Amino acid sequence: MMKKILRITALCIVLVSLLTFCGKSKIETKEDRPVFLEQVSTTAVAQLYADGFEQLSLNEKILAYYLAQAVIAGERIDYDQSHRHALEIKDILEEIVTHKEGIDPEIYQSILDYTKLFWIDHCQYNSRTKIKFVPTCPFDEFLLAAHAAQKNGAEFDLKENETLEQKLKKLEKTIFDPKFEPLVTAKTPPPGQDILTASANNFYAPNVTLKDLEGFKEKYSLNSRVSKENGKVKELVWRTGNQDFPAGLYHTELSEVIANLRLALPYASEQQKATLKHMIDYFETGDPDSFRKANISWLKDDSTVDFIIGFIENYKDSRGMKGEWEGVISYVNQKTTQMMKDLAANAQYFENKAPWKDEYKKTHTQIPVANSIDVVNAGGHAGPRIPAGINLPNEQEIRENYGSKSVLLHNVMRDARGVTGGKTSQEFLETAEEKKLAQKYGSLTVNVIIAMHEVIGHGSGKVSPKLTEDPSFYLQEYYNTLEEARADLMALWNLFDPKLIELQILPDEDAARTGYILEAMGDLTMLRRIKTGDRIEDDHMRAGHLIQAYLEKKILAVETFRKGGKAYRRVKDFNLFREGVGELLAEIMRIKAEGDLEAAKKLVNTYAIKIDPALRNEVIERCQKIHYPDFIAFVVPELSLVKDESGKISDVKISYPLDLMDQQLKWAGKK
């Protein structure tokens, strides 16, 4: 819904992954239900459960159903935004895996695994590392499999006089060559390229360069593709069009989105109706003002069922401008929401104690909306890899004048733990005391840090009045990294505040110490995700690495050491750690508030990007030995309408597919 709305926190990514994977057998949780479903390459696939959905009112259930359908209706948009050939490749893969008779089983499994990763990432690039992945089978075997599928009735949308071999040959490098367009997002491009030409995403035509955009003012910066024809740069707006506006890109998909939003209207609260109407207008016209009105209206609502739908996050765009399609449909978990409420009620307290200058401190005119939620559907950029925490909107002007909303995704965290355990602490923490603390406090501290990241991290601070644009305009491709680091640091800064014990959010200071221990270890285990090279491209990973490298190299509060032939990382001095956090937090807030691009560039380039390949290789090997996945992807619940004899909706049934392939093929209309 909002510009830069969904912040998938760096600490969320690092800390959730600290709760280690327990192997390849199915893990049973409540009612002996399966959570872990399978492992595809280094990604674990889990079933997400939405306990309590049945207790919602009928209107709330129906609202959730139609909103979920709206999210699914936009799925193909995210594929096309990710790469110009992603939809074509997706359709080819789905035709092969649904027409498998006669295909060599080993080759079929290779193609199926690649297809599952393609579904998870909405393209041939890992959505977190930004690095391209390729099939394990050779092109010739892939071609044979496609021919077998064609004989079985698979349709490959061939052009007139085009053969299947010709079609696949055109895509060979795109699918099989890891060195061809190696990164979907390249913020540190190689010599001779810029951040646009080195990035494979489809937000810009391949012939558009960064120089082309000098002096070019985008009217639809969040919701348009930039093209260049006859040397002239122009925007192709994402909208359906109406009597006053011509149809734009994705008009077919957005028309279906709008149709479902209209069906949701009768079941929405009055405030939600206002928000949905603004959203519908936005999808029709592309007008940024309608988008802004939707944001402000949405912030006024604190209903049980809530939603994020639209062009949201801009992480995939190296410029940090274009919003990726995504959606999250949820409801409040009344049993676990008190912590979020308590943090929100004390937002001004934490703001006042922030280590930055008073001129950058925000006055909270009202208590921010904050909840613990259970997710019933997540798609686009927000799924199947689902974030653990959300704060929105991130547009500074709206945040300062209208506030923000924060949520902790309770069932995502819970079911992530259904495929994780304590093996990371056993492998990567060196002392018995550290391991004991991690076992005792780890899960609790992770939740608290993520909650603070959202409520008092992203929701804090104000910028200098001399800034006439959003701070992201001034800080360019460095903004997202620094904003994620700022929210992480705000959580770490306040972890030892006695207010948390007073509010019974943390039991004691040992729980706070555990947070610092896990932060130090988390950056070490994060290295397993970067399989090649010596640079980090993802903003969330950069943010966590920036903090760790700063504390280790400049503050000397953390050290990496070896014992028994293994690398470990430990906190040398907890007080010094917190002092360093405060120092870095104050500087990043100053950079944001003043729009100091040169300082942003220096900080990120010095601490956030480079890694040690030898250390990375060791971490990968150790993680493989304990069956520790790089990521977790979720199969979300499925909702279906139940109607009585007269055709009236009498209920909404919730079910659990337990199968990634089954769900993705249904969403694609192929099952």
Residues of each region from the PLM?
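N-terminal-proximal low-complexity accessory segments that begin disordered
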Residues: T29-I92
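Active-site recognition of the HExxH zinc-binding catalytic motif
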Residues: S57, S269, I449-K462, A487
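Post-HEXXH active-site segment of zinc metalloproteases
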Residues: G461-A485
